[in-house]
Design a protein with these regions (language model features):
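Generic structural hydrophobic/aromatic packing signal, biased to beta-strands
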Residues: 4, 74-79, 90, 167-169
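Glycine-rich beta-strand-turn "strand-cap" elements at beta-sheet edges
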Residues: 79-84, 162-178
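Basic, often amphipathic N-terminal segments
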Residues: 1-74, 98-158, 177-184
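Hydrophobic alpha-helical segments that drive targeting, anchoring, or assembly
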Residues: 88, 92-95
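Charge-rich, low-complexity N-terminal segments
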Residues: 85-87, 120
Length: 184
């Protein structure tokens, strides 16, 4: 299984990491907890564009073409809470034409597109995808309240504008990242 992801500009990356840290310091599940595990630097703030079961050289070539429009400007929006029992806390990436076109191009490059065996909930299907940056997973309802308070103290030095700058695929089995852009 592979995910196709885009990472943030340096300032946005630092801001999200400060939020991860604030959550961890407040005792709330946070993506910061992955920093010390085997993923190391591969644990980066990112937006997942698609999931796929396999990526052969032909598909990787199509993906490289699909992400050719990077960098893409973004606005990082408010907090999102997904789930009903255990929650995912995330920051919205406000949809714009460039972000939606990038995600559609990546989906079109994949052989299984929105295959239900890969994307069980149709999360990445056209019109169903919600661009977001995960801050923490498996939060309780009480954790969500604590998180809101903790994140109120994490200012951003430059508004909400940023950019999606580079693309990678994450091999979930090998736990390895593969950059899809020329700088990778």
């Amino acid at each position: 299984m592979h995910s196709v992801e885009v990472v943030l500009d340096d300032e946005s990356d630092r801001w999200i990491r400060r939020q991860w840290t604030a959550l961890a310091e407040a005792g709330v599940p946070s993506q910061a907890r992955h920093s010390a595990d085997s993923r190391g630097e591969s644990n980066r703030p990112h937006v997942t564009l698609a999931l796929t079961s396999q990526i052969d050289p032909e598909v990787e070539s199509r993906l490289r073409d699909a992400v050719g429009a990077l960098p893409v400007p973004i606005t990082i929006g408010g907090l999102l809470v997904f789930g009903s029992t255990r929650f995912v806390l995330a920051r919205l990436v406000v949809p714009n034409a460039a972000v939606l076109a990038l995600q559609a191009a990546v989906m079109a490059a994949l052989p299984d597109g929105a295959d239900a065996t890969v994307d069980r909930h149709g999360t990445f299907a056209p019109g169903r995808w919600t661009a977001h940056i995960t801050l923490g997973r498996r939060l309780t309802a009480a954790d969500v309240g604590t998180a809101m308070h903790a994140l109120a103290g994490v200012p951003r030095s430059r508004g909400a504008d940023g950019a999606l700058t580079r693309a990678r695929r994450w091999d979930m089995v090998a736990k390895r990242e593969h950059w899809l852009d020329p700088a990778g």
